[in-house]
Amino acid sequence: MTSQYSNYSCPLNNIQVNVIGSSRTSDDHFLEQMLTKRKKTNISQDLHYLLLGLNPRELYQISFKLARIDEKKYKFNGNFNEGDYYPHKNSEIPMEDTEEIVHSDGYQTGARWMKTGVYFPKIGISKEQPDKERCLLLESLHAYFPVLVFTTSSGISLEVPVWSQKFVTTMTSSNRSVKRREKRKLEETAGPAAKKTPDIIETTPEDVVPEVYNAQYFYQMQNNTVISSESKFSSPLALQQDLTEDFGTFAQLDAHFNVSVQSCSSSSLSSPAALKHDSTVSSDSDFDDKNSEEFDAVFEYIDQQFSNHDQNPMDQQSKSIDLNQTTWAPQSINNPGYLSTASSPAALNQDSSASEKSSIVRDKKSDENCLDEFDRVFNELDQQFTPKEDQVQDLSNCTTWNQEPINNSIQSNQFINPELFYFIFHKCLIISWPSCLSCCRGSILPQHLRTPPLVPISQLLIISPLVLPPYHNFTTGSATVSPFASTPANMTIFNFTSDSSTTYSNSTTAQVFPDVANTPDLSYFNIAPAVDLSLFIDPFVQSGRDLSIERSIRNFTNTLKKAHRQKKTAILTFQSTEPMQLEFKYCTKMLLRTDKPVGNFSIQLSGPYLEHLLNLSHHLCRFSEYNLFVKAHFPRGSYGSLTSMTGPAVEIPETQENITIIWVKKDFPENVNKYPVAINSLITEAIASNGTNQVLLTSKYPSDCTIRFRKCGFMIEGVLVVKKKETVIIDRQILGELNRLKHDLLQ
């Protein structure tokens, strides 16, 4: 399987399917019930799925079908509250999958499927040969589960089972089968005229209920309560007598569970003493239906409280938030008055119906609740990792460093909740390879995330100038190249040339230079090697042009592989009939953006970057389509193309120690249009040589600015102030501490 899809940057076998609005897992053996009849009936399940792990640039067609779980025929176990089924005998019908129903949207990109999910509405089932479209033939009393079939544009298909959805098909009603059986007997004795007789056929409960309702076992399993084995559990009175034998009176039972049933408006349930009095004056013979319903309501409510208390704390909290918007909220069992909200058994029944309605609302708003849960988790992380005022150090006088690192509190022992960390990784689609792997040592991560990158994380440089509106004008800065006259650096250098400071030229080039000493006036951007070079097209681009660009991306990927095998340089060139706007991003943080459109653009890659792009791209693209991408805004009515080629090899030396820079923010004066702009970003150089212990930061800025060091994914305010066109010397050890602890937890 792996070798079959090894040519793809994101293989098909990494696809994950989650059911939206369902809390069940693949280990849950509970089988939902679906009714089948001769005509078409819609599936009672909500066929809405969330997809992960698709290749964002690959075209997929998704189909739906049902498959048999096993070769067994199932039977109802008599548990009406849970509706569970169990294998009864081997089925004579061979195991065959149903026909596939293709999604009406046809072929769509993986980014679109992962963003919106896939939904199959109005799919019907029938127990006879269906005569309508979008209807599947199923056999009664057999277990099925959904299967999603993914087909790529190249014809490769993969089936992904959805084990969290399992159901058994049953007939419409057992009463009808009994009536048909009785009518058949009448036809044999009285003749065909018996069909027209309107006599009502009486059926006994034994004919309707497949098995005896084992309420004793159900109550014992749900509440973990020891009940006398001699009890038949034939009525709530017998249940009460058994509880009285084990725990004493109802008052003692209340003390045992730390629950007190407070005043009820009904005379029969006014107090626990009244409950005891009713039990002493009643018997099996004179126990009426009214008291039976009241006891059932009380114990059903108690069961709900126990079941809500045993749930996952995170699920319980989200559930309590939703239910607070309705009529009642589940509370702790240790609260003595958690039953005081119901003044009567009728109120208990109303609360039960209200909880069912709220569960429906909760299922419909699952996406909103999920987003609220994300906000809550990241707010907690923000409060935990944001440094306090006494932890923020002044780095203006930074020639010496003898203090502890700022906010040096992110250690591996703080990630004590693997589920939460895994939750953040997969639900929020962390984009880049997390540098916190060095801190967490990969012990709490899933197996497919524990593979370390090919380069040390300390060598990854993330440069993140804050993208400001067009009126925030900057000028490019010049690098100090004297320390590098004999020491070349392994950097990807983007050289953006323009004929003036206010207008753009028709061409823009970007190349890899082996020696920075030969480029005295350039803007330096060191891209982390462990990223995937991909092209992302704006959503407003029409589908016709999108398909041509998709093919060009695949050709460029093949060019990268060819250049890597032949040890050559790959050149990526953009061409368009009209100028287009380009954006360079890394991990959704802007590296560079052109304010005005440019005509052509090319990137030259070689050396170890090709190896890192090819070997590590599959680790990153399984989380999101945004890694390192070039965003091309094609004007409406124009067409763009992407070409690639290979060139001669360019040797690049080993990477030096890199430094993390920084976000820049400035409150501009009112008259902001007087500064001409060439590129809408601040170019800040952080260059360190092997012979010095200091780093020079030079900023060509129209006014004073504040540079913030980004550490642990959060900002440290006001750590360094750079004056207008000033060069600041920063001790290397300070930057080393910041670089060692940086975490790319994107918000």
From Swiss-Prot:
GO cellular component, one term: nucleus
Entry keywords, A to Z: DNA-binding, Nucleus, Transcription, Transcription regulation
Organism taxonomic ancestry: Eukaryota, Metazoa, Ecdysozoa, Nematoda, Chromadorea
Portion annotated as DNA-binding: 33-199
Gene name in the database record: tbx-31
Biased composition range(s): Polar residues: 332-358
Protein's UniProt name: Putative T-box protein 31
Main subcellular localisation: nucleus
GO biological process, one term: cell fate specification
InterPro entries documented for this protein: p53-like_TF_DNA-bd_sf (IPR008967), T-box_DNA-bd (IPR046360), T-box_sf (IPR036960), TF_T-box (IPR001699)
Organism: Caenorhabditis elegans
